[in-house]
Amino acid sequence: MSKLLSYTARIILRNSRITVRQLVRGFAGFVSGQRNAPQPAYGRPVPGLLRQKMVSSIGKRSMFIQTQDTPNPDSLKFLPGVEVLGKGNTYDFPSGTAAHCSPLAKLLFRVEGVRAVFFGSDFITISKEESAEWSLIKPEVFAVIMDFFASGLPILHEARPNADTEILDDDDETVMMIKELLDTRIRPTVQEDGGDIVFISYENGVVKLKMQGSCSSCPSSIVTLKNGVQNMLQFYIPEVESVEQVFDDADRMADKEFERFEKNLKQKEPAGAPVGIGGGPN
């Protein structure tokens, strides 16, 4: 398997037309399938690049907001058509208590059913509670985003996005290489899915990372981490032996809530009925 990965990587690297996304997905050994096209506001079918013109009542400014599905059915990308944090920058708000540095995040957490908020370069990812409906959440999120950008208020107060991959004076060569690879090859691909990947630590050959945004509770996050990220890091950095995902209290709480919901679902279903949770964003 390792020989096959090495051969594949060398072939890919010789071809300058191959994108970073294709390179990472090539190491992953799986294809997540074609993404659904961006959805227009309120679900109206519009030909071409689906978009809905939305006019803010503040100022007379107009805004085009698109939504795009992610691999996680409980997370949705909102693309306002303007810069959010700027190229390559992200900021994660796993709970309302973490939103103290962002007026926009505070407003979004006031929308009933919103569980987590994530800011990217030009998008905002909203993660909802399992029982909440996108048909009810989306109109309120659209209104909050439009009104906020029309107000001219800063998105963040005294916060530095992406500080995890900043090169420090005491970083050794291996750590610097890991951070560089995360920023240039891995992070851009993960951000396309409405999430991010954060460097936590490196010690004794083990790289510890944290998934954010739509990737934090996505069922395929472990596969992405092991088959994609780990293989790429090991290929370029022989010192890396394994990659582990780090969970915080918010992640553990979300997992417990999901387990409780799934347990209740199984108890309500008649014997012999297929068990599963279906459906994506409405």
UniProtKB/Swiss-Prot annotation:
Highest taxon in the source lineage: Eukaryota
Keyword DNA-binding: no
GO biological process: iron-sulfur cluster assembly
Any GO molecular function: iron-sulfur cluster binding
Subcellular locations according to the entry: Mitochondrion
Short name of any one Pfam family annotated for the protein: NifU
Positions bound to [4Fe-4S] cluster: C215, C218
Keywords per UniProt: Iron, Iron-sulfur, Metal-binding, Mitochondrion, Transit peptide
InterPro entries assigned to the protein according to its UniProt record, in alphabetical order: FSCA_dom_sf (IPR034904), Nfu/NifU_N (IPR014824), Nfu/NifU_N_sf (IPR036498), NIF_FeS_clus_asmbl_NifU_C (IPR001075)
Transit peptide: 1-27
Gene Ontology CC annotations of this record: mitochondrion
Disordered: annotated segments: 263-282
NifU as annotated region, ranges: 178-246
Function recorded in the entry: Molecular scaffold for [Fe-S] cluster assembly of mitochondrial iron-sulfur proteins.
Stated family: Belongs to the NifU family.
Protein name: NFU1 iron-sulfur cluster scaffold homolog, mitochondrial
Species of the source: Drosophila persimilis (Fruit fly)
